[in-house]
């Protein structure tokens, strides 16, 4: 739980192997967090040495994004390990390839179920706990891919659009409870998950996303972009006529 001056002490990472998620956790540990729970399918073993080297107590629990009926139990297990959850980072998901999804509609539906449905069940489970505590922040990794969906990744982008809208609505539902939601909209981030994707303009590293999240938590922002230049860029992109939009590449 938070210490006497309100600093973050405990962090739960849903998607315990996510490179962006782990960068956020490491940043929070460097800033004083001391209890970390990494939630991933089959658990995370071994836990990242960088976190323990910084003095954090790191725990691992099983979490399957495709099994929404287990998500409340995962949150409860994390609470049993570290008590109140100061920050929960919602970082799980799958990217895949648009062409493969078009060839296999069932695979596309499974990906959408994880990238949207999994976040709905996990987000509601976390929100219930934060509301009960009366404090805490849920950090939701959305994407600029969901700001205006593009043809080259519309299965992934449409799920992110749904997630972004859900996170905003969840934030409004928590207003006045002491708990809050921070929506994070990164652009292209080179990670293992995106290794097959051609680089896009204005990339960000996992560390830069973590820095934006840290700043957003300190300022009690509701939304952060990484990098910040993407905010005005995508504000303008919303106005591009659809006849032109469909012809644009990355």
Where are these regions (language model features)?
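Conserved glycine-rich cofactor-binding loop
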Residues: 17-18
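Rossmann-fold cofactor-recognition segment
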Residues: 51-69
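Active-site helix of classical SDR
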Residues: 123, 159
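C-terminal helical subdomain
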Residues: 183, 198-235
């Amino acid at each position: 739980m938070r210490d006497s001056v309100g600093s973050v002490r405990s962090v739960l990472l849903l998607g315990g192997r996510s490179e962006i998620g782990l960068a956020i956790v490491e940043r929070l540990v460097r800033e004083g967090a001391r209890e970390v729970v990494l939630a991933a399918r089959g658990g995370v073993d071994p836990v990242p040495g960088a976190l323990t080297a910084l003095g954090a107590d790191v725990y691992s629990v099983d979490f399957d994004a495709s099994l929404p009926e287990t998500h409340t139990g995962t949150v409860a297990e994390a609470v049993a390990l570290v008590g109140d959850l100061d920050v929960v980072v919602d970082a799980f998901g799958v990217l895949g390839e648009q062409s493969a999804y078009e060839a296999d509609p069932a695979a596309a539906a499974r990906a959408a179920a994880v990238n949207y449905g999994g976040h709905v069940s996990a987000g509601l489970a976390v929100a219930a706990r934060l509301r009960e505590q009366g404090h805490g922040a849920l950090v939701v990794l959305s994407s600029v891919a969901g700001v205006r969906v593009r043809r080259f990744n519309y299965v992934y982008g449409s799920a992110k659009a749904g997630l972004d809208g859900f996170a905003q609505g969840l934030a409004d539902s928590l207003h006045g409870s002491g708990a809050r939601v921070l929506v994070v909209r990164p652009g292209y981030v080179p990670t293992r998950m995106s290794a097959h994707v051609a680089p896009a303009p204005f990339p960000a590293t996992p560390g830069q996303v973590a820095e934006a999240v840290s700043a957003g938590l300190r300022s009690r922002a509701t939304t952060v972009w990484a990098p910040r230049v993407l905010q005005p860029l995508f504000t303008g992109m919303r106005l591009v006529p659809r006849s032109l939009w469909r012809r644009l590449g990355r």
